[in-house]
Amino acid sequence: MAEDRPQQPQLDMPLVLDQGLTRQMRLRVESLKQRGEKRQDGEKLLQPAESVYRLNFTQQQRLQFERWNVVLDKPGKVTITGTSQNWTPDLTNLMTRQLLDPTAIFWRKEDSDAIDWNEADALEFGERLSDLAKIRKVMYFLVTFGEGVEPANLKASVVFNQL
């Protein structure tokens, strides 16, 4: 018999494509190429299949990670990497040391509607978000698209229980 305790209220916080920041990072790559310069030591340059997403913490305290909500409307793969960067891209570049482990990887196979994921890492990453929410209003993510998927094919959010 299931317990009859009330279910905790939940918050579903979407990951939103930050087009301005993605564009700014792409311009950085183009600028370096045009001037024939190299990236700073340890700098993470945005690759063509990567985009920057943000999560606005509408609540920062008393959150407990519940689950990822990821929908891919076609087969492919996305890797979501958190960053420790509090971004002011006109002043600071993203450095590789600011990329957080573990990453969350989600994929959809050709003949399936179901989303698979690297469950242990995705759960550990999600649990870290509850802690990071306490000290941030916004968190940035680097999302890498693979196997034919692009930003238009992804809908992602993080669901938290409100304690």
UniProtKB/Swiss-Prot annotation:
Free-text tissue specificity from the UniProt record: Uniquely associated with mature olfactory receptor neurons.
Top-level division of the source organism's lineage: Eukaryota
InterPro entries in UniProt: Olfactory_marker (IPR009103), Olfactory_marker_sf (IPR036727)
GO terms (BP aspect): chemical synaptic transmission; neurogenesis; sensory perception of smell; signal transduction
Intracellular or extracellular location(s): Cytoplasm
Keywords: Acetylation, Cytoplasm, Olfaction, Sensory transduction
Pfam families tied to this protein: Olfactory_mark
Main location: cytoplasm
Modified residues (N-acetylalanine): 2
Gene Ontology cellular component list: axon; cytosol; neuronal cell body; nucleus; synapse
Family indicated by similarity: Belongs to the olfactory marker protein family.
Role this protein plays: May act as a modulator of the olfactory signal-transduction cascade.
Known partners and oligomeric status: Interacts with BEX1 and BEX2.
Protein name: Olfactory marker protein
